[in-house]
Amino acid sequence: VGYTGIEPWIREIDQYERDGGSLKDLRKRIEDAGLQVESAIGFAQWIVDDDKQRADALEHARRDMDKVRRLGGKRIAAPPAGATRQENLDLFAAADRYRALLEVGSRIGVTPQAEVWGFSKTLSRLGETVFVAIESGHPDACVLPDIYHIYKGGSDFTGLDLLSGPAIHCFHVNDYPAKPPRTTITDADRVYPGDGIAPVARVLKRIAAKR
């Protein structure tokens, strides 16, 4: 009973350092507890159209990934931060930008995972996110699905059957209630697995069969 991995938020790691904490000491505490940093939650705006903003975001992502590496982690979430209100973002351009992010990660040893964000107007659907990963043409490309976000974005869970095991490194398991409806549900309405109506067991069995 229990868990073996954690997924800290980069902003919490930053706050820990600002408060005088040492990443070396934190890594030891994590490892002494028998835990592994499986991934981390970052918000670098790698996908945006503005060249200067995107260049700054890649440097931001580099710093974030270096922190993850120093904690013993090998992955970081790469959501469409900065483009959540943009409806017309070119997915081919997004794929090129994801490739640039992957190149940064490959130099550090941390893999950024293209993340589905159901509430966003960009990469809200599983198919869009998979498209960006495939068209990046990078061997480390992968996606980070989430049961709640797949539902919120309007994709069907059967789409996961098209993905092989290596395409998914981590999988977010968030359940959701029957009310409010999908169109108005928000992140704040998420519930623990088993407390909602999501087909959690069915989805996980299908994912496990792909491993």
What are these regions (language model features)?
Residues 19-32, 62-70, 156-169, 201-209:
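Short amphipathic alpha-helices and their capping/turn segments at secondary-structure boundaries
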Residues 12, 45-54, 84, 148, ...:
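The substrate-binding groove and active-site-proximal loops of carbohydrate-active enzymes
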Residues 5-6, 40, 100-197, 210:
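Acidic/histidine-rich catalytic cores of soluble enzymes
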Residues 9, 43, 79, 174:
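Conserved residues at the C-terminal ends of beta-strands
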Residues 7-31, 80-86:
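Glycine-rich, proline-tolerant flexible connector loops at the mouths of alpha/beta enzymes
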